[in-house]
Amino acid sequence: MKAFFSPWFATKLSIYVLSFTLIVFVCIMMLFYNYSRKQITEDAIDHAHGLLQNTATQISGELQIVEATLKQSVWIVEKNLSTPDSLRDILTAIVKNNSLIVGSGIAFIPEYYKEKGKYFMPYAFSINEGEEEIINFLKLGGADYDYPCMDWYLIPKLLKKSYWSEPYYDTGGGNTIMSTYSLPLCNQQGEVYAIFTANISLSR
């Protein structure tokens, strides 16, 4: 017996089939979208995490270079304590030979060199003039630069251990946003007589 299907039934069946196919297609697309979005998000997080790790490793390496530079220079500073004016050449060489260090100084305790006045802090720093880098020199300390009250001096002096300062704007010294690595210098009795510093710029 020959079956008979009306045109309407065929149309209706086609609609059902197409609707089912469309639903399946939409479900597949939604699953694919969710998977893709999740994958893209995970990839972005992994990339950001990797970038952060690389940056942290690079910064850590640079900070270690700054620390090592000062520690390796302590002996020559101690050797020249009897001639304070010669410290200028030492500080200038530190800044000139290390591109990470924009300024370096030695902040002596008040009246360490009585002939130099109450405060004495020789300080060398670099400035850019066009494409040329110039090393300048200052003697800091006084009412306009009361360094014994500054964190980079006071904290390592009290703790008798090296210290990285929080970022700050240095007026009178570097005149820029910087962080300072401070290394206490002690005499044979273990008393701090100066704070040896290296500044890194956070705005270059």
Feature locations, PLM:
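Extreme N-terminal signal-anchor transmembrane helix of membrane signaling/transducer proteins, especially
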Residues: 3-38, 42, 46
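Short, conserved clusters of charged catalytic residues that mark active-site
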Residues: 10, 14, 54, 86-90, ...
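Generic alpha-helical secondary structure signal
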Residues: 22, 43, 47, 61, ...
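Short, positively charged
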Residues: 44-46, 158-164, 191, 195-203
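Extracellular/periplasmic ligand-binding regions of membrane signal-transduction receptors
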Residues: 49, 53, 60-97, 101, ...
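Short beta-turn/strand-loop junction motif enriched in small, turn-promoting residues
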Residues: 57, 168-170, 185
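Extracellular/periplasmic ligand-sensing ectodomains of membrane signal-transduction proteins
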Residues: 96-162, 167-176
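Conserved beta-strands of PAS-like sensory domains
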Residues: 174-204
